Amino acid sequence: MNKNVLKFVSRSLLIFSMTGLISNYNSSNVLAKGNVEEHSLINNGQVVTSNTKCNLAKDNSSDIDKNIYGLSYDPRKILSYNGEQVENFVPAEGFENPDKFIVVKREKKSISDSTADISIIDSINDRTYPGAIQLANRNLMENKPDIISCERKPITISVDLPGMAEDGKKVVNSPTYSSVNSAINSILDTWNSKYSSKYTIPTRMSYSDTMVYSQSQLSAAVGCNFKALNKALNIDFDSIFKGEKKVMLLAYKQIFYTVSVDPPNRPSDLFGDSVTFDELALKGINNNNPPAYVSNVAYGRTIYVKLETTSKSSHVKAAFKALINNQDISSNAEYKDILNQSSFTATVLGGGAQEHNKIITKDFDEIRNIIKNNSVYSPQNPGYPISYTTTFLKDNSIASVNNKTEYIETTATEYTNGKIVLDHSGAYVAQFQVTWDEVSYDEKGNEIVEHKAWEGNNRDRTAHFNTEIYLKGNARNISVKIRECTGLAWEWWRTIVDVKNIPLAKERTFYIWGTTLYPKTSIETKM
């Protein structure tokens, strides 16, 4: 290799080295100036700075706001649930027992209910905590909500315990179930240590009752999916439909405190900077599944009480109401008979009792004691999440659940067999005429009316005559006509008793006595 070539190579290496040094110097100089612009990532040869990050976050937030504001749905319909549609049913049936006739009648009814207060029955606390983001859809109505899990921005929660002021608030930086729950417990600990000795908590209580006819009717009435709770209460809907049992359900809600979330100014305020709307769309957000967040949760306890009876009386509801209101029913034989055929089941959610703690008794005073005891919050009697409210993220409007369902209202009525007694001791010839209708039902539930007459009608009877006519419990339109022979040419037969459409009684006796010109009558009834 000659000297010229070696000189050329040496000069080239020197030029490359100097170029590298200059480049490194420029880069260092940029970074020195760049206390404002630090490297965060390199993508395709481009340096992405914190300003770029900020721009990306703004773009993500704007995109989330634009798309959520742009969702098209009817808030009245998105959480609208149409339950059972009743088509074919037998409207009436009749059954004979040894001393009674039982009529079971069924009538189609409907119930509509709109509520923003969604009852919590099952252990779904990790999906219904304050600040949780849910999809407003059928699953939410059925108490099994879908939640959106993603990076979140901080939220502020507050507990409405008295006297706490700023101590009753807390910022949750990453609002997951565990972190929100921890923040709530921290606020409660502060209350227990600093405020509980100074303030008392007024328990807010609500009460509702409903006669039970079907599962969908009951879900609409109490504002929750009732399947889970029925595992504890064991309501026999089949026996109710057949008319073999009658059931009333009571719901006592005792709210100790409520945890609320400060509402966001815009939808993106709930999502982390790196979250995109495309990611949210993949998690299910669309026109049919708009996002909502849990804006508040009520903590306390709920007591559900089942009152069940085998009585066929038409006054079951009134008897139960009298019992609930602690009225004196000692003089009401029918109410006492109904309650003697009744039993009571209570299940308690929350408070010092374990979840679904179940009590079965025939003494309603035991139920009253359960309601009365453990009705105030304390560390030993903690609150259980019993209901929550969801709010649409689009406009911060309340997400109300609208239930509508058809159901069959079944009423079973017992009609006890009875009898008519005819007693004639008068000094004349008498004739009796007794007629009635017997009601039954065909296989389609159509009423069949059969006219009946006593076989001894219109025969001459002299004193002393006494007979008993036995009537089934399905006897209706009972008529009794009695006439006596006067011996007068112009009025040979005189009607002395003529009663129509009298109700069936356990025993009704018709007495006649006296003379041809001065007959006497009386009617005695034993119900």
UniProtKB/Swiss-Prot annotation:
Record-linked Gene3D superfamilies: 3.30.1040.20, Perfringolysin, Perfringolysin, domain 4, Thiol-activated cytolysin superfamily/Thiol-activated cytolysin, alpha-beta domain
Membrane topology: Multi-pass membrane protein
Locations listed in the record: Secreted; Host cell membrane
Regulation affecting activity: Cytolysis of host cells is inhibited by cholesterol.
UniProt GO MF annotations: cholesterol binding; toxin activity
Segments traversing the membrane: 215-228, 235-244, 313-322, 330-342
Keyword tags: Cytolysis, Hemolysis, Host cell membrane, Host membrane, Lipid-binding, Membrane, Secreted, Signal, Toxin, Transmembrane, Transmembrane beta strand, Virulence
Entry superkingdom: Bacteria
GO BP annotations listed: killing of cells of another organism
Post-translational modification: Purified 48 and 53 kDa proteins with 4 different pIs (6.1, 5.6, 5.3 and 6.6) in decreasing order of activity.
Subunit field text: Homooligomeric pore complex containing 35-50 subunits; when inserted in the host membrane.
Protein family (similarity comment): Belongs to the cholesterol-dependent cytolysin family.
Protein name: Tetanolysin
